[in-house]
């Protein structure tokens, strides 16, 4: 049986001070402020770009494109949040992610609660 110190060690602390279980996230622990903060500091393409381009900016650009095309508010929101799990998990490039089904499972859990 795990002691309390081991259980607490399995949580990540967010920008706002929330404790989030990175394997079994709970909706009440997810805050838009934490998502926005983290994504604004995460670079797209694992940093393999000529200049810093944040995941947050990518999501905003996707949402702007959806608005320009006349898509519904629901689609615009989906564009804003499509990479939200990356605020809690490191992004993996698709060619690697396909070899890590457990990672995909955990990412799907985050997307479900977000």
Model-derived segments and spans:
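Metal-dependent phosphohydrolase cores
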Residues: 1-114
């Amino acid at each position: 049986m795990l002691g309390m110190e081991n259980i607490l060690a399995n949580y990540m602390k967010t920008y706002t001070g929330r404790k989030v279980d990175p394997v079994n996230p709970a909706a009440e622990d997810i805050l838009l402020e934490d998502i926005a903060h983290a994504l604004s500091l995460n670079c797209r393409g694992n940093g393999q770009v000529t200049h810093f381009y944040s995941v947050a900016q990518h999501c905003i650009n996707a949402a702007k494109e959806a608005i320009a095309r006349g898509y519904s508010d629901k689609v615009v929101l989906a564009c804003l949040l499509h990479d939200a799990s990356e605020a809690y998990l490191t992004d993996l490039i698709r060619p690697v992610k396909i070899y890590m089904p457990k990672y995909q499972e955990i990412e799907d859990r985050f997307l479900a609660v977000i």
